[in-house]
């Protein structure tokens, strides 16, 4: 059965409270169905993906970013990238967003969540961009499933109001950790970020299991994730292997 036909079945069987606008948005993104890929340092397409991310940050924020996360994930169709994000395991090195925090991420997050959290179970995401309407919604859904299969319990990131809107639309709750204060940057200057900080981004964290529970409760979202089950499994294994490697990378937002 083709992805488009599968999507039609998912729409017809979705619960009655499903937002029709969300259904139409996802239907457009799935016809034709996009593909998801991981790009590691030194990979054949890595430079192109970095250029795509940098160009989008420059276009939207007037920013000049030049450092990127260890694992870059892309979403695209027919060779055209429509969204991308980066992932870094906290166990590998200090996180970029820890510059904003008052202490190690596992301690700050543990206090906010009211539970003991192991650093090895935390992933940071960043370098998030999209060039097609709605792409970020689907990317977040698939990324959540990838993180779960890769063994991460928590995800942390710096969220602009637009990213917060995506999370709210999907029904994904987060813990607010602090404001992203550019005055605390040591790895890059605020000037390099253009207008990025004018939107007052927030450092937030989400529990992966809770996010997956929300996605699985919605018939449409669950059906969409099932379409990409094979890709999710493959990308989770890439992320798991890369997270266990020794060494470190330059910090990148």
Regions found by a protein language model. Give the residues of each.
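Accessory, usually C-terminal, subdomains that scaffold auxiliary metal cofactors
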Residues: 181-231
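Active-site/ligand-binding-proximal alpha/beta "capping" segment
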Residues: 221-242, 253
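Acyl-donor binding region in acyl/amide transferases
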Residues: 101-188, 194-201
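Conserved N-terminal entry element of GNAT/NAT acetyltransferase domains
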Residues: 1-44, 225-226
């Amino acid at each position: 059965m083709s992805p488009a036909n599968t999507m039609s079945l998912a729409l017809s069987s979705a619960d009655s409270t499903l937002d029709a606008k969300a259904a139409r948005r996802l239907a457009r993104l799935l016809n034709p169905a996009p593909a998801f890929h991981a790009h590691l340092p030194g990979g054949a397409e890595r430079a192109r993906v970095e250029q795509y991310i940098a160009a989008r940050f420059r276009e939207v924020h007037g920013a000049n970013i030049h450092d990127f996360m260890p694992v870059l994930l892309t979403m695209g169709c027919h060779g055209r990238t429509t969204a991308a994000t980066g992932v870094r395991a906290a166990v590998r090195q200090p996180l970029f967003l820890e510059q904003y925090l008052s202490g190690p991420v596992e301690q700050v997050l543990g206090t906010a969540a009211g539970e003991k959290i192991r650093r090895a179970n935390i992933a940071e995401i960043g370098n998030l961009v999209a060039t097609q309407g709605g792409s970020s919604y689907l990317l977040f859904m698939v990324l959540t499933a990838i993180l779960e299969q890769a063994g991460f319990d928590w995800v942390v990131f710096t969220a602009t109001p637009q990213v917060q809107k995506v999370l709210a639309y999907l029904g994904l709750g987060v813990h607010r950790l602090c404001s992203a204060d550019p005055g605390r940057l040591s790895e890059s200057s605020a000037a390099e970020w253009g207008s990025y900080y004018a939107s007052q981004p927030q450092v937030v964290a989400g529990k992966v299991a809770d996010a997956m529970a929300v996605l699985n409760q919605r018939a449409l979202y669950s059906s969409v994730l099932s379409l990409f089950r094979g890709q999710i499994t493959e990308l989770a294994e890439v992320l798991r292997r890369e997270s266990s490697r020794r060494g470190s990378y330059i910090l990148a937002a």
